[in-house]
Regions:
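ABC ATPase nucleotide-binding domain signature region
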Residues: 40-42, 53-117
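C-terminal lobe/lid and adjacent interdomain/linker elements of RecA-like ASCE P-loop ATPase modules
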Residues: 163-181, 188-238
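GG-anchored amphipathic helix commonly corresponding to the ABC/SMC/Rad50 NBD signature/C-loop
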Residues: 131-155, 163-175
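N-terminal pre-Walker A segment at the start of P-loop NTPase domains
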Residues: 1-32, 37
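Conserved glycine(s) of the Walker
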Residues: 50
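The conserved Walker
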Residues: 46-47
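Conserved D-loop beta-strand region of ABC ATPase nucleotide-binding domains
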Residues: 154, 184-185
Length: 238
């Protein structure tokens, strides 16, 4: 039985203008519905394949601030979200999340600033700007992850070392086991290795489920580690 907070998303492309750039994203063509059957779902694919666009639309349609944060965040520094949020309908489950967070690597600085401005006696500031970029990013993620929560993460590995990615991996896995749901855009072969997750690939002109070993993130990393010198010779010397 599917007991996820967001069980799926249904697309209505008639609500998108005929000249919208969204019509040019190959992976979106023909897609009518995506199902989220597991506590952890990954979106993978090449840059510009539409994965972050869809995650952002899911976040906005579900009530999150487009730039990130909780549903209570109301700030805006630059309005960049697409019209896709108006063309999707979220299929919600019978459970209601107790907490939620939309975390974006590209707007992390703005969110961290808002976290400090929203701080009070009961919720003191974690002073994210006094930490290194990677430390503050991981701290923000960890401080806002709880059981029975809904978390949408866009490239959370961007600021993290491989070791810190493993730390985040453990936290995500534990929270998912305790009733949380994660939908994550990533290029990280480390995060993608979390057991029992669904992986949606946005490459080859369609959105489809794939295995970990079939992701480009895994294949390119494996190729480089196992054949580094040969690969460098081909790339750098022709």
């Amino acid at each position: 039985m599917n007991d996820q907070f967001i069980q799926g998303v249904i697309f209505d492309w008639d609500k998108i203008g005929k000249d919208s750039y969204l019509k040019g994203i190959r992976a979106f063509k023909g897609v009518e519905k995506l199902d989220f059957n597991k506590p952890i779902t990954f979106f993978v694919g090449e840059n510009g394949s539409g994965k972050s666009t869809l995650l952002e639309a899911l976040a906005v349609a579900h009530g999150f601030n487009p730039e990130g944060g909780t549903k209570n965040y109301v700030f805006s520094t630059h309005d960049t979200h697409s019209e896709l949020c108006d063309a999707i309908r979220i299929a919600k489950g019978y459970r209601k999340e107790k907490w939620g967070y939309f975390l974006r690597a590209e707007s992390f600085y703005n969110v961290a600033t808002q976290e400090e401005e929203y701080a009070d006696i009961t919720h003191p500031s974690a002073k994210y700007h006094e930490k290194s970029h990677g430390e503050s990013f991981l701290a923000l993620a960890q401080n806002n992850m709880n059981p029975n929560g809904l978390y949408l993460f866009d490239e959370p590995e961007a600021a993290l070392s491989p070791q810190r990615q493993l730390t985040l991996l453990m936290q995500i896995y534990r929270c998912a086991k305790e009733g949380a749901q994660f939908i994550i855009v990533t290029h990280s072969p480390i995060l993608l290795g979390i057991p029992d997750a669904d992986i949606y690939c946005f490459d080859n002109g369609r959105i489809h489920l794939c295995e970990y070993e079939d992701t480009e993130s895994y294949q390119v990393t494996e190729m480089f580690i196992n054949n580094r010198q040969m690969l460098l010779d081909r790339l750098l010397t022709g």
